[in-house]
Each structure stands twice: as C-alpha cells, then as structure tokens.
Amino acid sequence: MRLQILLRGFSSTPQTGFPRGDPVRLHGNTTTGLPIPLRNSSSNQILLREGRGDYPDGARRETRRYYQGPTPTPRSLSPPIYRPPPSYEESRRRRKLRRRQDGRVKYPASPYRTKPPGETSSDDEDEGRGGHEPRPQRRLPRGLRDRGERAPERRRPPVQEGEEDVDGVGALLDDLKLYQEPPGDPVEDSDSPGSRLTPAPPDLSRYDSTRLQVDAESSPPRTPRPAPTLVAECTPGRPSPQTGSGQQALGEPPSRPSRGHCRDPRTACLLIIKGSSNQVKCLRFRLKSWHHSLFSYISTTWQWVPSVGSNRIGRSRILVMCEDSAQMDRFLCTVKIPAGMTVEQCSMASV
C-alpha cells in the first residue's frame, strides 16, 4: 500500500513555472495569475511593439506599428497601402475629367481645327468653349516662311511739270535695281572650276554712252574735280619700259632713272619698284617708317595675274607717287634701293 502511494507521488508531473492563481486584468487584458512584468523587461518590450505596455517614464501611450500620423480612426487601423504616383497620362485624364465636370475648357474654339465633312459647329458648342474669338494665325519663323511674291519694285518718282527727263536714265535704273535679278539667262563663270552660275549683266548697248548733261535750270552745273596727272614721259635717249630693258639680273646694282625726265616740274611722278615679295614688303615698311616725307602716296604689294586663273606672274611690285620732279630727286638720292630690285619711272600705261 505504501509502495503504491510512493509510486503515485513520483509518477505525478511536477508543476513548472509560476504558480497558477485566479485570472487578473493587466492593462485591460485578461491574463492568468502571472505577475506584472517589469517596465524594462523583455516582455514589456514585446508589449510596446504590439501597442501595449508601459514606457519607462510611467505613462501609457497609444502606439501603432505601421502608421505614423494623427490619432488613428477605425479605417486607419490597418496598415496603409502604398500607391505609386499617377502617370502623366492619368493625371492629364483626371484634369480633363474635372474640367468637364466643372464646365471649363482649357482652349477656346478655333476655326483652324478640322472637322468631318457635313458636321458644323453650333452656337452651344461655341458658348461651351468660352465664346472667345478665334486665335490669330501663328507667325512662322523667318527661315520657314513661304517665299511668295517679291516686294513691289522700286520705281522712280514721277517727273513733275517743268522738269526734263534725260533719255535712257529711267530705263537704265529699272535694269539696275538693287533687289531684282538682271534679265538674261545665267551664264557659267569661267574663273570657278565648279558649275556655279552667275546672272548675265544687263544689256546696256541701247543706251547712249555719251555723258549725260542736266539742264542748267533743274540743277546748277558742277565743276569736275581735276584728277592728279600720273603720266610722265621718258627722255628720248632712254628706252621705253615696255621693251623690257628695265629688267635687271639678280645681284647687279639697281638701275636708277635719269634726272630731268619730267618736262613740267609740277607734274606728279610715278615710280615702280620691283623685286621679290619679301624685299618689296621690307622696303615698303622702311619707306613708311623713316622716309614718309619723300613721297605722297605708296601702294600695297601687288602682282599681275592672267585673264584666266589666279596664278601670279612676274615679281612683286609697289608704286610710289611723288608730287613733282624735285621730290622724286630727293627720294632717289636719299633712299637706298637694295640689290636685286629695280626702280623705274613709269606712266599708267607701263604699270
């Protein structure tokens, strides 16, 4: 008998954990007879994550796990659903829908919008669009405008009574208009290697080549300004520059024109200096820098070219103009011409 009682005592399952007692309420939750957990225990941290439990400062706060914002409502107890922002087409469709509901239209009616044949716009539709006037036609940029008719041609003012029109002047001005292409078929430019076409010049053969004279009553006569005389004849004993005797070999002393070649001392004298490009440029710089008082004008460096093509012919040249023979004599006596260069007196025919 005693053995059976001992076996029953050993076979009974021992009770583990906290002793069970009457149910108690912990912060509104019915629990078993468990003691109140400490505020810094792991159980309290679990309750805090679930929205229950005490904070270390002793105050209870209503917390939520997913939603951070104002006081929750019955609809916001569940976690919020992430919605991506609407696309551009969706937002545009919503704006159109709101305008249609409010009775507003973005753009007024325009007569340039095409409609199917047989369909006409009513007054109600125009009123629904706002009743605005049609927009003006948009101006195209300068480069995209259609090339329509040309601007009206510039005409001469009508001849008033008492004035005399010179024969051929009106027709000549009509042919030489600034913004009008000259009549005639385009001709090919021989200088350019490509197939570039240039308009033919106007035909001026039907006009009088004599100098036009204006009546003294219409405008007072103007005295022509005398041009400087550039022609200077050479002495009979000196050969002409056209014969080529003025050409000089490289290394020989430069030739100088003889004195007393100008008959009239007041006649302007013209000298032509020839040499290589570098020699002529250096001499011109030296003349303009230190001997500018010995001449009146000096040209830039130039060379001859044939009628067809652009190949340079001969040596480089410069022209020096003196006021009279006395100034030319001072120029020849003062300026030292480098070896290999030639200086000759010439006229416009020999240039």
From Swiss-Prot:
Gene Ontology CC: host cell nucleus
Residue segments, region Disordered: 11-262
Record-linked InterPro entries: E2/EBNA1_C_sf, Nucleotide-bd_a/b_plait_sf, Papillomavirus_E2_C
Subcellular location: Host nucleus
Compositionally biased tracts (Polar residues): 28-46
Regions crossing the membrane: none
Similarity comment: family membership: Belongs to the papillomaviridae E8^E2C protein family.
Name this polypeptide is given: Protein E8^E2C
Highest classification ranks of the organism: Viruses, Monodnaviria, Shotokuvirae, Cossaviricota, Papovaviricetes
